[in-house]
Curated annotation (Swiss-Prot):
One BP term from GO: thymidine metabolic process
Quaternary structure and partners: Homotetramer.
Organism: Bacillus subtilis subsp. natto
Record keywords, A-Z: ATP-binding, Cytoplasm, DNA synthesis, Kinase, Metal-binding, Nucleotide-binding, Plasmid, Transferase, Zinc
Family the entry assigns: Belongs to the thymidine kinase family.
Stated name of the protein: Thymidine kinase
Any one GO CC term of the record: cytosol
Subcellular location(s) of the protein: Cytoplasm
Gene giving rise to this polypeptide: tdk
């Protein structure tokens, strides 16, 4: 299976890893980035926290037919030999299933990069699907430390912070900017102010 899933918490370096992997890959390749607001086929950019960026083509999570059409165009009409997808957690499970099917049918590797957990501690549907179907050697977990002050534990949760405290309820997909921290379980489940 030529499919990988690179997953970690917010700020763990997934986009940095995608850019690194993309730049050292000698094959013809294309980078795609999943968006909640931009149209499929529009130009996008994958940015890492270290300031580096990579041009990409946007996939809108709600435009299933256009996303499949785009992938088919990439596979059938270009010389693309590898596909990199950033923010894959935003894709619906059905889109990931179709992408996996196309990848296997036409032997074009796809590398997914995305979060596994929502801020409520539940798996994203697409991430759950990838974690279920892929063998462990095709899953790369990228870890990072807890962002709570003076904590040296490994973070396990993406915490949405509201009024300085962890919020564990609300809509998963919000278009306005929210504030998130990567926290260990002790700080995630502690109801005291984090910041």
């Amino acid at each position: 299976m030529d499919i990988t899933f690179n997953t970690g918490l917010m700020g763990s370096g997934k986009s940095k890893k995608l850019i690194d992997d993309y730049l050292i890959d000698p094959k013809e390749k294309v980078a795609l980035s999943v968006s909640l607001t931009e149209d499929t086929f529009s130009r996008g950019k994958i940015e890492s926290r270290d300031g580096r960026s990579l041009r990409s083509i946007n996939l809108n999570r709600d435009q299933f037919k256009q996303n499949i059409s785009l992938l088919e165009i990439i596979i059938f009409m270009t010389n693309t030999q590898t596909i990199y997808i950033d923010e894959s957690q935003f894709l619906p499970k059905e889109t990931v299933e179709k992408f996996v099917s196309l990848s296997e049918s036409y032997h074009v590797p796809i590398h997914f990069y995305g979060l596994d957990l929502t801020f409520t501690g539940e798996l994203f549907d697409s991430s759950s699907h990838l974690l279920t179907i892929l063998p462990s050697e095709n899953i790369n977990r990228i870890s990072r430390g807890c962002e709570a002050s003076k904590c040296s534990k490994i973070a396990q949760y993406n915490a949405r912070i509201v009024d300085g405290k962890v919020s564990r309820s609300g809509e998963t997909f919000v278009e306005e900017k929210s504030y998130y921290l990567a926290l260990c379980s002790d700080h995630y489940y502690n109801d005291e102010k984090i910041i």
